[in-house]
């Protein structure tokens, strides 16, 4: 006679199933399970679970005959998967050779039916059978949320310790520029020149993080830019502190089109070489990734935010303005003076700073995120941004917008707050991956991609991960006292794991470079251990390709009042006085 469980008992044992709702941390956001691939495959009662007296034992949920070649290397059981491409689904997740090979139902085909991946592996054209054997490790995903590792596309590589902060928050890919605590790096995300690029690519070997470097894009002639792409740069960065003139923009985009790399831009705050209209004309309809598109982080004052309505622009935010709060304005003035080498004793420097910090456009930025008109979130690490808070501030913004404007209608994901949750998740996972040409390997949990995964307990979602996997191997974890008799005694804090050590580190992390550099043989004798992965498909993309964030409103900014309108409607909201995912999580 089958055992009957209440819905609560089932959720406590095997995790939530279709129709169950899960709160994300202490926000007002609820996600509802849309599909249960385990139940669809083998039916309820056919789940597998590890532990004493549980299912994954020899001859039961574990095959006694499966050889290594046929078995998963790792299975995450009964996980709640949150992914902007896949939706909100319950499934087992199978990993082999560092890649996601199956999402569905795993176990022992000798005694279980309905096993295997729901999705085809693009490398084989087949669905993986998801066999658990003697070669298979297990992570219990029951009651956990699994997302793809986060991607931060706006990194000032000022110090290597940023990587520890970022991975502790759930970021697994960092893209940007710099050479350490140099004055140029404090302000601009550029690793200029072949020699500096080689040193940073060599340094990347030491860290459990996918890394890629932008070169300096401000140059009036193409030859110096070509040299940097051939040296391994994944893209070019135009920054106003180096002179972002229409001529420099035009040359830079021309080289990017030639080599299929992305261009990121921080536009001309002072409007010295032209207004926002001149910059948009210089784009000539070519793809470009605009950093801190609201303008507090830099850009044409007061109306750079207009670019969020251009079809060729991939707009991103940086996290200090996310979300708009009662403290945002005061904090930004001090940050800006430091980061851009300004002097409080020089009136022109003070005026420059004040021109960039506008409550009206920051409030509109909240609204544009909720509309899906700003597609990407990033940090601007140590240069007016916090590298460990991309994920937190994304979800704080989503919470604030639900509080102020209510539920967000979404046709494909109408249940609970699924549509809003997936829209905001896309801003730090799949959309930055698409923008920077790395979506073929990271950015989602789709079968065939690198197994860069983050596991959260729902109460700690977006704030403090339990585990961070790089290339299918645990690299970082919330770990207790190493001298304790069990893993959990306090103090628990983030510690590097075996995936962050030795050759396991270089086997499970990627360094992104240009295809041109690989074709040119730039790294043939470089002695690098990490896999070099080329960026691709950077140029013929646009806002239409931004997952769940492809809105193209016509945006206007009043030059006197800074009021922002989208399609004729004023965009504004009140600053938050209280936020979730804040002090209650960081008392110690």
UniProtKB/Swiss-Prot annotation:
Recorded GO molecular functions are: nickel cation binding; urease activity
Summarize where Ni(2+) 2 binds, as residue positions. 237, 266, 292
Q: What is its main location?
A: cytoplasm
Known PROSITE patterns for this protein?
UREASE_1, UREASE_2, UREASE_3
State its cofactor.
Ni cation
- Quote the catalytic residue positions: 340 (proton donor)
- Binding locations of Ni(2+) 1: 154, 156, 237, 380
Which positions bind substrate? 239
Q: Main EC class of this protein?
A: hydrolase
Q: Which GO terms describe its cellular component?
A: cytoplasm
Q: How is it modified after translation?
A: Carboxylation allows a single lysine to coordinate two nickel ions.
Q: Name one GO biological process term.
A: urea catabolic process
Q: Which domain of life is it from?
A: Bacteria
PANTHER family reported in the protein's UniProt record: UREASE
Family named by the database record: Belongs to the metallo-dependent hydrolases superfamily. Urease alpha subunit family.
Query: Know the name of this protein?
Result: Urease subunit alpha
* The species this protein was found in: Opitutus terrae (strain DSM 11246 / JCM 15787 / PB90-1)
